[in-house]
């Protein structure tokens, strides 16, 4: 792993203006991912290298999805009745500068988090509504294999937990960790699903391809999650190539995510209409199997919504109103000047298009 000092020295960066950024939002980068960067300012660079604009964004929130408010046990988030999110560690192979959980970087990796499984497991065992557990973090696939085995085994001992999911960036950011042993371990706990974070075709290195192949050959259903990022992947050519290549690797594109409203990430955010426009273009370019859902995770913990005309109830100059999974009307802020294009787009798009 690179320290920021080592990375800056290698790339000839002046660290002085970036030191306050790194202090507020620490830097982590695997040597594998750094090796995929082809030049200063390229799409991979912009995802992981600190930017002074991270300290200038006052419009976002530390915890835009209200995960702390929805946490009934340490490191557990219970937003939907039959599903929970379990943050099993705080370590990542890279610190994505657009991360929703940037607030958790400040304390550094937590060893206590990895030692005390009891409260989360007890909560899951006691609430029989919970059928689906999503392991995230951090990154669960950075855990020692014995620890990962323990977590999966203990979840499988809970009869009402039917599905286990893992969210990870390891196959693309630190693929050497995906070994035959890891793939075989995960394959013992079916039904288990792995959703992999990929944002750009340049991340699909030969090593990443091999990691995905190992997992798929173990019979593990693979999906992908992609964040729509301004100037990085916000066009149909880039995303079309990414999604087509993922599908050929047996990784089903699952979500294209609108940027969360996290403090320090505003420079990555695209207009909502951009995502809608990109998906419309993709439907004419690639197989329907390769077209993901375009999703907004509503601020305040109101849940994910796949953006379709039927879910948008009204659009104003500064905000639109979206109906969430409970039928609740939720306000979502728009970028300045975004309203006319979004209104026009949704007006001309039928429900059946989706």
Please annotate each region the language model reported.
Residues 28, 279-354:
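C-terminal accessory regions of radical SAM enzymes
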Residues 98-99, 128, 209-234, 325-354:
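Mobile, glycine- and charge-enriched loop segments
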Residues 110-118:
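Short cysteine/histidine-rich metal-coordination sites, predominantly Zn2+-binding motifs
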Residues 118-125, 129-132, 141-286:
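Conserved AdoMet/S-adenosylmethionine-binding subsite of the radical SAM
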Residues 26, 72-101:
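N-terminal pre-triad scaffold of radical SAM enzymes
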Residues 1-79:
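Flexible, acidic/Gly-rich N-terminal and inter-domain linker regions that tether
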Residues 33, 96, 254:
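Conserved, mostly hydrophobic/aromatic
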Residues 99-111:
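Iron-sulfur (Fe-S) cluster-binding segments and ferredoxin-like electron-carrier domains
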